[in-house]
């Protein structure tokens, strides 16, 4: 059976992501697969590539042919170089580095959210106090007018 390693499209319109799959070469693009060996999401920055290296090595070893896009992904992850025994088996996969400033940014956002909550609650309390004071001010003249007016019987 002629097997290929290729991409299976997932996602929705204008937001596609792919699964790296091993499939019989005669099957449809999104047809039944033999094994899923990874994922590829081009929508993130940088693109997310996750391939099970041991399974990719196995399928390449038994003769599965990668499609052109999968060949490029295998080069980026270093699996193709490892399979061929070439230099640069570590690959050129870019990763998002969290870094030390990421925690500081998260803390700053949380502090800002708490300050915003406090400001909103203070504004609500102030508005409520003003409304109560205005209501009390309206009731006082009405009571005085009622006392001054003679009662008709």
Swiss-Prot record:
Query: Which family is it part of?
Result: Belongs to the bacterial ribosomal protein bS16 family.
InterPro entries in UniProt: Ribosomal_bS16 (IPR000307), Ribosomal_bS16_CS (IPR020592), Ribosomal_bS16_dom_sf (IPR023803)
Query: Which Pfam families would you find in this protein's record?
Result: Ribosomal_S16
| One GO cellular component, as annotated | cytoplasm
Looking up PROSITE patterns in the UniProt record yields: RIBOSOMAL_S16
- State one molecular function term (GO): structural constituent of ribosome
Q: What is this protein called?
A: Small ribosomal subunit protein bS16
**Assigned keywords, A-Z:** Ribonucleoprotein, Ribosomal protein
């Amino acid at each position: 059976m002629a097997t290929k390693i290729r991409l299976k499209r997932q996602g929705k319109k204008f937001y596609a992501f792919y699964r790296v799959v091993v499939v019989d070469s005669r099957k449809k693009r999104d047809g039944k697969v033999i094994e899923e060996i990874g994922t590829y999401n081009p929508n993130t920055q940088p693109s997310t590539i996750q391939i099970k290296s041991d399974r990719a090595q196995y399928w390449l070893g038994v003769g599965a042919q990668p499609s052109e896009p999968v060949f490029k992904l295998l080069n980026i992850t270093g699996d193709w170089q490892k399979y061929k025994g070439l230099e640069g088996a570590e690959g050129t996969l870019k990763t998002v580095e969290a870094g030390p400033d990421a925690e500081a940014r998260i803390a700053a956002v949380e502090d800002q959210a708490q300050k915003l909550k406090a400001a909103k609650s203070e504004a609500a309390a102030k508005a409520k106090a003003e409304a109560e004071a205005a209501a009390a001010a309206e009731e006082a003249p009405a009571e005085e007018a009622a006392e001054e007016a003679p009662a008709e019987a």
